[in-house]
UniProtKB/Swiss-Prot annotation:
This is Large ribosomal subunit protein bL19. Belongs to the bacterial ribosomal protein bL19 family. This protein is located at the 30S-50S ribosomal subunit interface and may play a role in the structure and function of the aminoacyl-tRNA binding site. It comes from the Bacteria. GO terms for molecular function: structural constituent of ribosome. It holds the Pfam family Ribosomal_L19. One of its GO terms (cellular component) is cytosolic large ribosomal subunit. Keywords: Ribonucleoprotein, Ribosomal protein. It comes from Nostoc punctiforme (strain ATCC 29133 / PCC 73102). NCBIfam families: rplS_bact (TIGR01024). The gene is rplS.
Length: 120
């Protein structure tokens, strides 16, 4: 057994199996575990998926939202223990793999058409 096969087998055990299908353009709500003192609480983060990187255990999504007039982007490792839940709220109809152009847009120009052919 080579070193790569050993690493893949260990990573396969760590993968989460209960993740929904997430596509670029979707509006998602990510529940992030935050530690305050000794307690953990779940903080929701809602926004549009503007980028997705596959790669086994290193799979990430970049979620963008506008908070108090300022664009905020966060990168989430999908298989991280800090991610409590991911819920798809709305499917978006886009024709790009990366939606970085949304960074330059303001207001109604950032809206994405809804897609109805994929289930939530």
């Amino acid at each position: 057994m080579s070193a790569q096969e050993i690493i893949r087998s260990i990573e396969a055990e760590q993968l989460k199996s209960n993740l929904p299908d997430i596509y670029v353009g979707d509006t998602v709500k990510v529940g992030v575990k935050i530690k305050e003192g000794e307690k953990y609480r779940v903080q929701p983060y809602e926004g549009v998926v503007i980028a997705k990187r596959n790669g086994g255990i290193n799979e990430t999504i970049t979620v963008r939202k506008v908070f108090q007039g300022v664009g905020v982007e966060r990168v989430f490792l999908l298989h991280s223990p800090r991610i409590d839940s991911i819920k798809v709220l709305r499917r978006g109809k886009v024709r790009r793999a990366k939606l970085y152009y949304l960074r330059d847009r303001v207001g109604k120009a950032t809206r994405i058409k809804q897609r109805f052919d994929r289930p939530l």
